[in-house]
């Protein structure tokens, strides 16, 4: 993403992971600050937040069912032992964390973002229109004076990046020198610049700030005019001057004065501009592509009233400082939702997420979006992320938004730019995986992005120019190695919790900046608490399902403990929520019963015929009373196991939903048994049985008018899962073929035709499930996709990887 984005409303918002150069915070009760100057929040790593007693308890009926549905939150003994007498319970910690995040999401404005000393200095340079010789915005100079760091520099206090510290510091020195104030601070800052300028050569080029090669040399020229001499003959500076000359020769002057481009973001570094023409390219808010420094430069040259209004509003909003870009409303809305989804805690915030996506959809255009609303310039990063989230949540969005970014067989991050950003192409890849049938531009995007990312990974070049994050190679690697069709929610969350850097992730613009509503430790700590709580419940369920396995001697019918574990893992990694325990266990037990019957009787046609006959007899007589059945001992044992399990599931559903689903369960099983009897093929009808069982256990029903769509979903799901099951059976004793990063297959392989058909059918299924215009409950449709993705995972994931995922998801606590 070229820049970034956020949201709007005018209530003061609670602050999270904040800094001295952030908009002054209104802290949450319970957040402790290290000093009055440094506003960074200190988080207690053992819990989320303790709400101060002065804050009234908040009722949250909208998510109470998520926290309590007769299934208690699990508190490990070791956690209990460490708790202090006044420490709140795990349930309350989660509830308080949820309340805090709800408060954040409910108070989003135009973007919570850190202050940029560089941009603040540019605004400080503006001369008062009515009183020449004095600053137009004196509070910016006060901010500069108050925020010099102990090492005499200005910039991000928690990450030392030479580019960032130098450009911030030199800009502040120039501002102080221009108005002849704070000479000691100015001298100290100048010494820092001279001592550190040679370090530029040692930093990763990918982490060079946006437009640094234009902006920094321009600052050096301004410094010379003020009598500030800075040696610029070091090799690093010579390289920067070379890049500047090259970039300036590539700038299409005729275009930039007539058509909105990203160059509007960096006008302060460009010489010989026609301001009369450029003023016509202002954004609606008076800014030049939402850049305070660019707009300040424009104000100096034009005295434009709209530029003044934009800057004046920012200076007042942020108490003297200004960010490097503003607003960032779309960026904040989109990325906050993405983080909550990937951290596995989105279920707590469904209304807030819906509100965020409604906001994004309101400002969506046929050409995509950028980081802020009402922009005439778009970027592929925000467009890709917005497209993906909107489509996932049932909004109708056209892939034609990507046409303007297509350049031959490649895609560019911003129209007119040739260099690529890893995260921009990564998010394009993620978006392209949600393609519907006949969306050729997404097919091309997926192929290009997959190849691009794979080459970068091979070359160990997964550094990004837009963000410095904890584990970008891990994020990209997971996307390449686990196709979205095979991505199980709990696997993604377990790994992403380790990849997400919380408040330590830093964004790269003209300066380093922070987005505390996107990257913060509150999300992270809540995700950890919730994950471990869910995992504790899963461990209890695993113990109970092993008892069920032993009670009915499932092992005696040929199903191993290993098979039991894998089956329970797949169900749990797909449906993990504590409140969905009955659905999860029904899935696991149903799948085990199917595998038991299929493996034990599959090789004997006689027994395959006998079992359905006995099943019919038992169903007709009714097994409620546990009557002993005629027939062979094995058949009798299996029949008893099936009906005892079905009756137990029915009782669970009756308790949870007040509905007797016994006849429907029997009917679904009868259909599967007859299908199996006729063919006995791998996976034949199993997906339908699982989907029907899960939806019944969840209390989901569909109307008569939706029957045709329901049957179409069943047919497509059965077809795909049957093909996947057949493929898995053929390849279970050899290494599964890895789906290529471009989403395709090697067509020289004789099995490729069927795999391509699977991909085609998957696209159709995804379209049916994500299409909201048909009126069917999305939860019902989502079950079809969830089950199908589990089959895809099983078919195409290497056994060693499955073992790793099982260990991580079920048995390794998050710390």
UniProtKB/Swiss-Prot annotation:
Its EC number is 5.5.1.28. Pfam families: Terpene_synth, Terpene_synth_C. GO terms for biological process: diterpenoid biosynthetic process; gibberellin biosynthetic process. Substrate binds at residues 247, 465. It catalyses: (2E,6E,10E)-geranylgeranyl diphosphate = (-)-kolavenyl diphosphate. One of its GO terms (cellular component) is chloroplast. Inhibited by high concentrations of magnesium. Its cofactor is Mg(2+). Mg(2+) binds at residues 379, 381. It is found in: Plastid, Chloroplast. One of its GO terms (molecular function) is terpene synthase activity. A motif (DXDD motif) lies at residues 379-382. Keywords: Chloroplast, Isomerase, Magnesium, Metal-binding, Plastid, Transit peptide. PANTHER family: ENT-COPALYL DIPHOSPHATE SYNTHASE, CHLOROPLASTIC. Belongs to the terpene synthase family. Tpsc subfamily. Diterpene synthase that catalyzes the formation of (-)-kolavenyl diphosphate from geranylgeranyl diphosphate (GGPP). The Asp-Xaa-Asp-Asp (DXDD) motif is important for the catalytic activity through binding to Mg(2+). This is (-)-kolavenyl diphosphate synthase TPS10, chloroplastic. The gene is TPS10.
